[in-house]
Amino acid sequence: MGTVSSRRSWWPLPLPLLLLLLLGPAGARAQEDEDGDYEELVLALRSEEDGLADAPEHGATATFHRCAKDPWRLPGTYVVVLKEETHRSQSERTARRLQAQAARRGYLTKILHVFHHLLPGFLVKMSGDLLELALKLPHVDYIEEDSSVFAQSIPWNLERITPARYRADEYQPPKGGSLVEVYLLDTSIQSDHREIEGRVMVTDFESVPEEDGTRFHRQASKCDSHGTHLAGVVSGRDAGVAKGAGLRSLRVLNCQGKGTVSGTLIGLEFIRKSQLVQPVGPLVVLLPLAGGYSRVFNAACQRLARAGVVLVTAAGNFRDDACLYSPASAPEVITVGATNAQDQPVTLGTLGTNFGRCVDLFAPGEDIIGASSDCSTCFVSRSGTSQAAAHVAGIAAMMLSAEPELTLAELRQRLIHFSAKDVINEAWFPEDQRVLTPNLVAALPPSTHRAGWQLFCRTVWSAHSGPTRMATAVARCAQDEELLSCSSFSRSGKRRGERIEAQGGKRVCRAHNAFGGEGVYAIARCCLLPQVNCSVHTAPPAGASMGTRVHCHQQGHVLTGCSSHWEVEDLGTHKPPVLRPRGQPNQCVGHREASIHASCCHAPGLECKVKEHGIPAPQEQVIVACEDGWTLTGCSPLPGTSHVLGAYAVDNTCVVRSRDVSTTGSTSKEAVAAVAICCRSRHLVQASQELQ
């Protein structure tokens, strides 16, 4: 694969002069020296110029996107993404049409790559003056300006060469990831290093930009430190996680650790094409890099994930919200933050690991010993979220080797389930990010453990809604997960509840902001449950003093969660939906002016029960947890006056947060309780016991 050239300036030229430059010997040679072969453009001019002269103009319904971080932008190179239903042949036809219409206006363009296997579209070098024209082309969905991505490692001590300190008998995981292929998109790799010799195949793929301040590319062998180190972390003989995993290297970062979104997209398409041509076992793609938020980068990751590929990425080293970066913000990617030997967030000078709701878990990322490219027996220590992501890629390879049939959703749930819980000091994170950031550090499961019997659930937070009264927030589960309950949270306490609704054939959790509120979060409880069938039963406001009630009336269905929403601004003594331990077991009860929603599910052997923990007066936090063997599916507050900020699940614990009444001037003595719905599958438990 050829190298993607860096950006250059473009000038509009009169059409006769343009043709002279293209067709004249001297002009052709000069242009080829700078920008390559323009034969395709000449053919496009000859074949399409006349036919498109009278083509009708289309209203620009497509959108334009660019990186929010100006220094990372690469104007002059654009990814043109076509609509989902576009036939693959239209990619090349649309590209030729753009070239022909640009030439009519006196502009040079160059098609750098046409995507066929990853997404419909193409990569083009052109003047920004042509964007309006390109956005009006038929089939165009959106256009994104190219931008930079960066390796996410910080050298801890480059001068020190350290021998590996691990003993072989300390780490003998089952199968060692031998059934899994790991693709590493990074710098090149020193494949003859003793840590990885015979385990790595360096492909001929290369798509990197020129280095800053230069007009050339250094040989890959001269700058393979970052990739070599990460390859050793993933599958090194002494210091690797998955010692048996095979690894393939694609070069998308230059010697300065810098690449482009477009170059990485071409690398992902290379992987997809390889997968189609020669299907193999489970694939893990390690993306130890980060750039600004990119719609097209995230879309490409989604495509690859839905094709069965597991993608693991670095959260980023900017001490910032990971949702502002790609591919860390892609929901289908497993995003990894970095911790040190004390399980605390990694600090890198004035920066450090990224955090927030887009991070799935953390992993070791400080002072990590691995292979050094200084010599074939050298080792070096490095730090960063790249190293953390490499650990999780190795763990993923181990799990997939033990259970090759695992889906991405199942793998993610297992990574979360087996992580060390509540070991990170949350005070390191900004206050508004603490509740959103998972307190999880990755760990391998017990070597003899098969978790097929376990009911797995995780908590998914939405983005923060706007502050307007009608603003809403939506939380979604992954493709193979089922939404079992929905809750909401507002730091101001001003919200209008939440509900489960259908959207695009999937259940989603929608939370509603209230007048005077600062915004709200929707919180989905997403679970893996075979053969599950769920529905929502709703009761409108009862208008009676006894409150609104709704229950699961279908035979065999059990209550997995309750939610409510209301239109009035202040319910006063609002009582949100709860499952009470006394009375009807499958019933949600709420305020008479609220609509109450019961999430009712049926699955083989599914059984649920309620746990409630209350305190006699309002406190800032009340919790209740499910016992071992049971999984939290629903979390609600009781009673839920204006002091209650909301409820959410942390691992297997239901947390209800309230405002400190001492700061509000309130004299309320109303009790507050956390109500948890705990479920398990007798069918899965029995299957596990039979295996034992």
From Swiss-Prot:
InterPro entries: PCSK9_C1, PCSK9_C2, PCSK9_C3, PCSK9_ProteinaseK-like, Peptidase_S8/S53_dom, Peptidase_S8/S53_dom_sf, Peptidase_S8_subtilisin-like, Peptidase_S8_subtilisin-rel
Residue positions of the active site: D186 (charge relay system), H226 (charge relay system), S386 (charge relay system)
Signal peptide: 1-30
Co-factor requirement: Ca(2+)
EC numbers for this chain: 3.4.21.-
PTM-bearing positions, type Phosphoserine: S47, S688
GO cellular component terms, semicolon-separated: cell surface; cytoplasm; early endosome; endoplasmic reticulum; extracellular space; Golgi apparatus; late endosome; lysosome
GO molecular function: apolipoprotein binding; low-density lipoprotein particle binding; serine-type endopeptidase activity; very-low-density lipoprotein particle binding
Disulfides per UniProt: C223-C255, C323-C358, C457-C527, C477-C526, C486-C509, C534-C601, C552-C600, C562-C588, C608-C679, C626-C678, C635-C654
Site (Cleavage): Q152, S153, R218, Q219
One Pfam short name: PCSK9_C2
UniProt KW keywords: Apoptosis, Autocatalytic cleavage, Calcium, Cholesterol metabolism, Cytoplasm, Disulfide bond, Endoplasmic reticulum, Endosome, Glycoprotein, Golgi apparatus, Hydrolase, Lipid metabolism, Lysosome, Phosphoprotein, Protease, Secreted, Serine protease, Signal, Steroid metabolism, Sterol metabolism, Sulfation, Zymogen
Domain Inhibitor I9: 77-149
Every Peptidase S8 domain range: 155-444
Propeptide: 31-152
Modified sites of kind Sulfotyrosine: Y38
UniProt region (C-terminal domain), positions on chain: 450-692
Role description: Crucial player in the regulation of plasma cholesterol homeostasis. Binds to low-density lipid receptor family members: low density lipoprotein receptor (LDLR), very low density lipoprotein receptor (VLDLR), apolipoprotein E receptor (LRP1/APOER) and apolipoprotein receptor 2 (LRP8/APOER2), and promotes their degradation in intracellular acidic compartments. Acts via a non-proteolytic mechanism to enhance the degradation of the hepatic LDLR through a clathrin LDLRAP1/ARH-mediated pathway.
Subunit comment: Monomer. Can self-associate to form dimers and higher multimers which may have increased LDLR degrading activity. The precursor protein but not the mature protein may form multimers. Interacts with APOB, VLDLR, LRP8/APOER2 and BACE1. The full-length immature form (pro-PCSK9) interacts with SCNN1A, SCNN1B and SCNN1G. The pro-PCSK9 form (via C-terminal domain) interacts with LDLR. Interacts (via the C-terminal domain) with ANXA2 (via repeat Annexin 1); the interaction inhibits the degradation of LDLR.
Name of this protein: Proprotein convertase subtilisin/kexin type 9
Organism: Macaca mulatta
